Regions:
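N-terminal targeting leaders
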Residues: 1-175
């Protein structure tokens, strides 16, 4: 429990927002499994009430339906629909994506200019999505680090950008 508390403190989201984000993720995942089953492979990532959808759907219509359904959920402020209408990815592709995510997170931890606990890394088909509450300078460092990881095809920013003053305020409030 102490470890979890430390992560909450380092996260720039307040504990209430973190809880809302987790609730959105769980609700969306449960809904998608029940409604679409094996017709989709959707990863739901939530940061600061903004939802990133990655993965595959069997048709373009399903891609649109999934995004619309999630957008209508309580507490969701934005949906970034990065789903593709394609055959569902296999274990090998998903394992490679998990490996890339781990490599990027490790590189972030090694750089004091990246607030790794205020960021989320999502990888799908070699494309990396970075979410979080960061300054423009932090975003640029994170993007450059992610781009340098072998196997990364593309890096997309899904950040909430804040000023240096907001960074100091948020970091101070969470100590």
């Amino acid at each position: 429990m102490l470890f979890r508390s430390a992560l909450v403190i380092a996260d720039r989201r307040n504990p209430g927002t973190q809880s809302i984000d987790r609730g959105i993720q769980l609700e969306a995942e449960s809904f998608l499994i029940k409604k679409y089953g094996d017709n989709v492979h959707v990863n739901v990532s939530v940061f600061n009430r903004r939802v990133l959808l990655t993965g595959e759907t069997r048709t373009e219509q399903l891609k649109s339906e999934v995004a619309s359904s999630v957008k209508a959920m309580k507490n969701v402020s934005d949906v970034f629909n990065e789903l593709v209408a394609a055959p569902l990815s296999g274990l090998s592709a998903r394992t490679n994506d998990a490996y890339l995510t781990t490599r990027i997170k490790g590189a972030f931890l090694a750089d004091k200019n990246v607030p790794s606990n205020s960021m989320k890394v999502v990888t799908e088909a070699g494309k990396v999505y970075l979410m979080g509450i960061v300054t423009e300078a932090e975003a640029n460092v994170a993007v450059n680090i992610a781009r340098e990881v072998p196997g990364v095809k593309q890096v997309t920013k899904v950040f909430d950008l804040i000023s240096e003053a907001d960074k100091r305020r948020l970091d101070g409030a969470n100590k």
